[in-house]
């Protein structure tokens, strides 16, 4: 009987030793160059880097189709029988998901790993993410209508692998709400128990406005006007109400407020060639309109 106790104690001790060895082994073999808990500010910078929606596919597909459909330009090779056929997905749509991937991770980290005042420091930063995605998604839904948005890129956080497609009407409702919330958030101090919480400084991590939250407020508020323009012929009263509310806050009204996306010092144009001559020539409707209104362009 005594021998059984000795053997049992030996086995328990061995298991504990092996378990601790495994834990130590896992710690030792963790690659120090891999970031397991990224800084939310850096995720925001990556979202900005992924934001560029006016790249090759935008010019080659989205704008190529849009300009001809709106009779702004005419194809230099003549209109083909497939002129109205969409055979590819848009650039804006693919870019919004590249941005969304970073935004969802940023939001998850702030909401689940930070608490109290430390979490509150990122309130403005989280608010900036909505207008980034909305700007790109607004272009995409103009072209293609419904798109996966509210449930997209949520699988790793317990969401679905088959997100639903939100209709344009549903998206406009959502974006109106989100943009209003963003503007109101950026227009007011963040407080806890009556004490102001200083917001996380972005500085050079913000390649658009260098951490100037006031300019981000103007950008988000101006997007509300773009949304109102899309609604004016569908629901005029609603569009005007959006404009009236937006008028309570500042908008982009000068060159210093421009959302200037400085892509790089060298690759400033469409990859594969800087010439856009093959995209089409000015249509009769456009040229005549410009002449009648003395447009010098």
Language-model regions, residue ranges each:
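Membrane-proximal, proline-rich intrinsically disordered regions
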Residues: 21-87, 94-97, 101-105, 112-116
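Bacterial Sec-dependent N-terminal signal peptides
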Residues: 1-30
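TPR/TPR-like alpha-solenoid repeats
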Residues: 136, 143, 227-228, 234
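Extended ligand-binding clefts on enzyme/binding-domain cores
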Residues: 38, 239, 243-297
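Conserved, well-structured interaction surfaces
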Residues: 72-150, 154-194
């Amino acid at each position: 009987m005594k021998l059984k106790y000795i053997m049992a104690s030996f086995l328990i001790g061995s298991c504990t030793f092996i378990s601790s060895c495994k834990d130590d082994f896992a710690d030792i073999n963790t690659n120090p160059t891999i970031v397991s808990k990224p800084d939310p500010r850096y995720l925001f910078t990556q979202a900005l880097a992924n934001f560029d929606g006016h790249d090759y596919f935008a010019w080659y597909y989205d704008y190529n189709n849009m300009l001809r459909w709106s009779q702004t330009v005419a194809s230099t090779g003549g209109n083909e029988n497939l002129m109205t056929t969409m055979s590819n997905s848009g650039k804006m749509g693919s870019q919004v998901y590249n941005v969304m991937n970073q935004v969802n991770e940023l939001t998850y980290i702030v909401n689940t790993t930070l608490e109290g005042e430390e979490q509150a420091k990122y309130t403005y930063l989280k608010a900036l993410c909505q207008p980034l995605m909305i700007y790109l998604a607004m272009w995409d839904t103009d072209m293609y209508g419904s798109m996966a948005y509210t449930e997209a890129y949520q699988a790793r956080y317990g969401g679905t692998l088959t997100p639903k497609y939100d209709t344009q009407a549903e998206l406009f409702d959502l974006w109106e709400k989100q943009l209003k919330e963003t503007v109101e958030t950026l227009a007011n101090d963040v407080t806890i128990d009556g004490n102001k919480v200083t917001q996380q400084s972005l500085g050079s991590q913000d390649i658009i406005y260098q951490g100037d939250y006031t300019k981000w407020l103007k950008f988000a508020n101006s997007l509300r006007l773009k949304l109102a323009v899309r609604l004016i012929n569908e629901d005029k009263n609603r569009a005007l109400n959006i404009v009236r509310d937006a008028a309570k806050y500042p908008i982009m009204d000068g060159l210093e407020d421009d959302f200037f996306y400085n892509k790089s010092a060298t690759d400033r144009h469409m990859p594969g060639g800087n010439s856009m001559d093959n995209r089409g020539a000015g249509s009769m409707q456009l040229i005549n309109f410009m002449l009648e209104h003395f447009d010098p362009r």
